[in-house]
Amino acid sequence: GTENKTKVEDIINLERYEYFDYDLYPDYQNSIGFSQRGCRLACKFCVVPKKEGKNKGNSAINGIWRGDPYPKNIVLLDNDFFGQPNWQEKAKEMIEGKFKINFSQGINIRLIDEESCEMLPQINYRCSKFKNKRIYTAWDNLGDEKIFMKGVERLTKYGVPTSHLMVYMLVGFKKAETMEDILYRFNKLKDLKCLPYPMVYDRNNKELKKFARWVIQRHYKFIEWEDFSQENRNKFYRDQKGSEDQMDLFHNNCVVSALSETGDT
């Protein structure tokens, strides 16, 4: 979402720079890098196409790995892995090299095809902590419902369960978007058994920030949105006849449940 189009290469006046200063984080064990740059899409809220251009290949997977004694955990910064010309070779590297891959920037589910879906379950894809199986993707626009659902259908056809999908939901970008529109997307994702994750575009919108909190901390498993909203929240707890301590315990249980379930935070 940032409007900053400056690249490291622009600052140091090099055509390409792919080195990461791990010395800043001496205890960090994973390997970080790009196997590709750019994106096939041109979303209005995203700077990637302007900053990185069209999709092109970058480093090999073995080139990203820091080597022994570091674990074969790769944090990919790719914005469109399956859009690069030689993604099959890099997927083969992942599989044959027995790497764990965190697709940290997600995959483009709207553009995913049969070949990509067939290959993906063979890759050991993981969450950011490399504990749970996780694929990150997005459903940012209500109008993309059909193509999003088609992508989900393709993934499940080839063995990626919906419970492995964390789906980012951009909220607050479209001025005409209503809370009903947002809840429609959320409920669809919940019914699919995906993990919804709202991304609030307008950080000044308190209601949307509250909605994000309700979803991300998995309060929705215990409280309806109407009850969680600020004007009704206190009334809800009073109706439950809960003391202040019980309210705190209830909140903590929600958070613990969310964290233990996802393994992503």
Question: PLM ranges: what are they?
Answer:
Residues 1-3, 49-151, 162-172, 195-199:
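Core AdoMet radical
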Residues 1-32:
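Glycine-rich beta-alpha loop elements in corrinoid/cobalamin-binding modules
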Residues 5-9, 41-45, 52-55, 83-85, ...:
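Short catalytic/ligand-binding loop motif for oxyanion handling, primarily in non-cytosolic enzymes
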Residues 27-65:
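Canonical Radical SAM [4Fe-4S] cluster-binding loop centered on the CxxxCxxC motif
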Residues 40, 68, 129, 157-159, ...:
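Alpha-helix termination/capping residues and helix-transition junctions
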Residues 43, 91-92, 186:
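Non-transmembrane alpha-helical segments in soluble domains
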Residues 93, 154-157, 188:
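Alpha-helical scaffold elements within enzyme catalytic domains, especially in hydrolases
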Residues 159-160, 170-265:
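Auxiliary Fe-S-binding modules of radical SAM enzymes
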